[in-house]
Amino acid sequence: MANLNKRPDWIKVKAPNSTEYYNTKDLIKNLRLNTVCEEAACPNIGECWSKKHTTVMILGSVCTRACRFCNVKTGRPDLLDPYEPQRLAEAVQKLNLKHVVITSVDRDDLEDGGASHFAECISEIRKSSPNTTIEILTPDFLRKEGAAEIIANAKPDVFNHNVETVPSLYKTIRPGARYYNSLSLLHNIKKLSPEIFTKSGMMVGLGEEINEVVQVIDDLREAKVDFLTIGQYLQPTKNHAEVAKYVTPEEFKYLERVAKTKGFLMVSASPLTRSSYHADEDFQKLKENYQQKLMS
């Protein structure tokens, strides 16, 4: 039996130590912004921050959910910061970002789940950096009527919402969420604003069966999702769900081949794939693939 306490070689990454990494870290700290890169202990932080790529986390740093895979703090959330959209826009300008990814904690305590705050952030960035493309990675807005409409009207270039895992594991891994609500949100955004690229991702290695992963792939395509990401689950701390399996690079290639036959514009499946990993480059490829599809 494999030793799951020891990560295989294909998971290991170099510790961050570049000048660019520390410059990005200092700027984020000075502007008092949160990032999912730090809060979720992303393994790709060194590479991304060295390239001045970062995923900013809005709506505070405390989540109202307690998902078993996530390293973000949970509890009573912070008060909304009305100046956060302006500070975020300033950071985008100072980092000279061509593409920015904005995510957030879940805010079940807010009437719209934080949708209008996302919209304000998009608006502020459009004012100061009109050429920057904007990708948002949102919560599920469970039971938040009108939230999808607010997001669709804000017109991000990419709308991302992760289903995270297969339906059979929701009760233990993602207990505060509903699988079909997530699918519905993705489909609704596409129906409300067909020009917005939609994206979703999931983790493997939590104990799911391969046929369950394929079913999720089918469900996401049925919801008109354009871009699919699949990555290895890594246990953030001993208090989180344990890794059931380290999926091999060959198995990821198989899943990628299967997904590509379903009609997605883009698929990224590898051990270190994360929702926002290489988001800038992937957005360019996404647009190119869309144009090629129109011409075919």
From Swiss-Prot:
InterPro entries: Aldolase_TIM, Elp3/MiaA/NifB-like_rSAM, LIAS_N, Lipoyl_synth, rSAM. It comes from the Bacteria. The gene is lipA. [4Fe-4S] cluster 1 binds at residues 37, 42, 48, 276. Its cofactor is [4Fe-4S] cluster. Signal peptide: none annotated. This is Lipoyl synthase. Residues 49-265 form the Radical SAM core domain. Binds 2 [4Fe-4S] clusters per subunit. One cluster is coordinated with 3 cysteines and an exchangeable S-adenosyl-L-methionine. [4Fe-4S] cluster 2 binds at residues 63, 67, 70. SUPFAM superfamilies: Radical SAM enzymes (SSF102114). It holds the Pfam family Radical_SAM. Keywords: 4Fe-4S, Cytoplasm, Iron, Iron-sulfur, Metal-binding, S-adenosyl-L-methionine, Transferase. Belongs to the radical SAM superfamily. Lipoyl synthase family. One of its GO terms (molecular function) is lipoate synthase activity. It catalyses: [[Fe-S] cluster scaffold protein carrying a second [4Fe-4S](2+) cluster] + N(6)-octanoyl-L-lysyl-[protein] + 2 oxidized [2Fe-2S]-[ferredoxin] + 2 S-adenosyl-L-methionine + 4 H(+) = [[Fe-S] cluster scaffold protein] + N(6)-[(R)-dihydrolipoyl]-L-lysyl-[protein] + 4 Fe(3+) + 2 hydrogen sulfide + 2 5'-deoxyadenosine + 2 L-methionine + 2 reduced [2Fe-2S]-[ferredoxin].
